[in-house]
């Protein structure tokens, strides 16, 4: 009998990659659940990517301690959920001058087979309607947009 941490799921060589970009200090649990279901069904690697906006007033590579302190617990929680679901995970942290710039930088250096775009009714929580339209028009691969319903079954059960 093994005690301790479960071994991370291993991706098959050349496995598809499912990108889930997010920002604003939050990843909706319903989006995370959907991403893990899709990744499991496709035999894909789940790639949660926290996007950090770097103001023009500082260098792009400047240390952003506060933003990283917000991002890391979210990425670690997503990794743990993926590990518990038996889904391979490869988390990312990407910087840019805007959310679009950060995504463009990520797309320039990595291959993704599908993108699951979290959409929130609260634009302060991440992508606004202009970002969403831009992503749908410029994404290098199949892109799904998911906006969880308010008052969903999950929310009612959690109360």
Predicted regions and their residues:
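Extended, non-globular alpha-helical segments
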Residues: 1-11, 63-71, 78-79, 83, ...
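Gly/Ser-rich helix-loop-strand patches that form or flank binding pockets
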Residues: 1-8, 34, 108-159
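Small/aliphatic-rich secondary-structure junction motif
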Residues: 7-65, 90, 138-149, 159
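A conditional alpha-helix N-cap/helix-loop micro-motif detector
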Residues: 28, 71, 96-97, 125
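Amphipathic coiled-coil/heptad-repeat helices and related helical stalk/stem segments
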Residues: 28-32, 99-100, 128-129
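Well-ordered alpha-helical segments embedded in enzymatic catalytic cores
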Residues: 31-34, 74-77, 102
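CheY-like receiver
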Residues: 38, 102-106
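Charged docking surfaces used in two-component/phosphorelay signaling
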Residues: 93-102
């Amino acid at each position: 009998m093994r005690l301790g941490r479960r071994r991370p799921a291993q991706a098959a060589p050349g496995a598809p990659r499912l990108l889930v970009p997010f920002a604003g200090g939050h990843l909706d649990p319903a989006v995370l659940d959907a991403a893990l279901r899709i990744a499991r069904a496709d035999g894909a690697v789940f790639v949660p990517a926290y996007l950090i906006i770097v103001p023009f007033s500082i260098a792009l590579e400047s240390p952003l301690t506060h933003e990283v302190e917000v991002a890391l617990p979210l990425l670690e929680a997503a990794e743990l959920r993926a590990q518990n679901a038996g889904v391979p995970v490869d988390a990312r942290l990407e910087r840019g001058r805007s959310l679009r710039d950060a995504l463009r930088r990520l797309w320039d250096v990595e291959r993704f087979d599908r993108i699951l775009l979290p959409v929130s009714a609260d634009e302060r929580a991440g992508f606004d309607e202009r970002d969403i339209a831009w992503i749908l028009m410029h994404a290098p691969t199949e892109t799904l947009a998911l906006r969880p319903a308010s008052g969903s079954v999950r929310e009612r059960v959690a109360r």
